[in-house]
């Protein structure tokens, strides 16, 4: 027993050689003796022992016929500074456990974290079949199959066909910490050299190792992030087949490093390699993510293709930021006012008034070209969501002088106004109508603006229905044509089954009270059961016809005169007094009258503000000044 403890203590303190060990064993010391759960061999083989002697190890093993071989902690041994490959070979030949996991990693991964691992040791261990990634996981991919039922014909081009979606394992998408990963991330420690030979061997042993990702990033990403970078190491880890998304993540991380580490200099060789032959989509997404003009300019300076084409693609397919446009202009791109605005609108979601304003103010005009190049197509802005309503309204106000056709229709015959009605955008509907949108357009399916308003107001919950009713009043108060009215009446009469809600009578009354202003006889003939209601409406109509300014009644002012001519009436006390009235049925007309008064006041204020002494505008007759501003703003 005494010799057992002496042998253990000598091994524990590393104060032993083969001769003394042999003597103690011959004196009866037992190499299998345990103290605190440790045998002498287990106590001796530790990373704290900087001088593990092979002959001592072999003696402790052979004296008991290698029964204690797994007391030799191979994880501890691989962390020591004096690994003997012949000893490793012997241990492996004698059956030492090499496939175990300790603290979540295997022995090859553990060895990769040491300060100066040897290629021969890697080769010995990997040739024994130890995995290069002890905890590999796989991604998934979506499998899409079209459902075809027996006896049914399906058009494969029909967007309404049914599809079955399933998730399958993607064995090409490998995820986990590899030997290469462990080797790279530990190189940033003091005294830990980065060996090109080690990297080349590991990659040659398993080429796919470069494609493994941990937290969605490759080993190259971590190398550029943590280590002092050498081109030859970069080249060994780099693969042009990495996804464009990952390459841009690597480049972003590399460029940002200059703000994290002092004296870090950008190597243009690395920037060029990461940018070379990359899909511009990823490059532009990277520019958006950086939000730093210095970094964006660094990328653009190394971009070898056309910056002009890059700008066009940017405004066409990406969320646009003004600072990125400015950087492109600084690198030689030319911003065109209408060309780039029209491209900007083509991407769904591009609805930033600040971007539109910047392009309008700073974009160049195309000279000596077709007039269409100097107009803006606003159709791609629609349909819009209510959450973006104010943004779209701001954009429309900015683009107003350049809109090519406010009544442009799509392939279904739907106008911009029609789309805004469907999305219950009250402010957009009002602005469009005030600026010339045609309320009488009929779609290919026979809908009028009035029709869709009535149907949707009848279908939706009260909160939304109120918006459609308000829009209906706005449209009708502009008085549709008799052709539009007849189309609406015919459609609603043919599709009575659509009206199952409780709003249908009140909705029809709203229509009728304006229809009679257009064609009284026709309306009465179509809605004879509403004669009593029509009679009540006539009383308010008569009141509007009785109030006159120089022989012109209020209905004529509101509906028969053009905008500049109306300006002569709106400041008249008779008109302003009438605009203060409260009608039961026609308050929308009163609302329109007050809006005219408000707009007229704005024009008067603007004229006064800009009419300075000796100003050219101030020399014009007041009526001419009113006419100019009326056409521009009323």
From Swiss-Prot:
SMART domains: ANK (SM00248), Pumilio (SM00025). ANK repeats lie at residues 36-69, 70-100, 103-134, 175-211, 307-337, 412-441. GO terms for biological process: symbiont-mediated suppression of host innate immune response; symbiont-mediated suppression of host type I interferon-mediated signaling pathway. Induction: Expressed in the early phase of the viral replicative cycle. One of its GO terms (cellular component) is cytoplasm. GO terms for molecular function: molecular adaptor activity; RNA binding. Keywords: ANK repeat, Early protein, Host-virus interaction, Inhibition of host innate immune response by virus, Repeat, Viral immunoevasion. PROSITE patterns: ANK_REP_REGION (PS50297), ANK_REPEAT (PS50088). SUPFAM superfamilies: Ankyrin repeat. PANTHER family: CYCLIN-DEPENDENT KINASE INHIBITOR 2C-RELATED, POLY [ADP-RIBOSE] POLYMERASE TANKYRASE. Plays a role in the inhibition of host immune repsonse by counteracting the action of interferons on early events in the viral replication cycle. Belongs to the orthopoxvirus OPG025 family. Interacts with components of host SCF complex CUL1 and SKP1 and components of the cullin deneddylation/COP9 signalosome complex subunits COPS7A and COPS7B. This is Ankyrin repeat protein OPG025.
